Amino acid sequence: MKKVPLNCENCGNRNYNVPKKEGSATRLTLKKYCPRCNAHTVHKESK
């Protein structure tokens, strides 16, 4: 498993590092809490 960072869609802040299987072709998108936005927002996997 590889840890990948998740960026907030609204502010671009890197808030979370989550494990992901290597060899997975799709990018991860999760709805998580962003302390900078003070709300639950969509977080996308960054490179």
Swiss-Prot record:
GO CC aspect terms: cytoplasm; ribonucleoprotein complex; ribosome
Cross-referenced NCBIfam families: PRK00504.1 (NF001764), rpmG_bact (TIGR01023)
The entry's keywords: Ribonucleoprotein, Ribosomal protein
Membrane-crossing segments per the record: none
Annotated protein name in UniProt: Large ribosomal subunit protein bL33C
Membership in a protein family: Belongs to the bacterial ribosomal protein bL33 family.
The species this protein was found in: Staphylococcus epidermidis (strain ATCC 35984 / DSM 28319 / BCRC 17069 / CCUG 31568 / BM 3577 / RP62A)
Keyword Ribosomal protein (UniProt): yes
Gene this chain is encoded by: rpmG3
Entry keyword annotation includes Ribosomal protein: yes
GO-annotated biological processes: translation
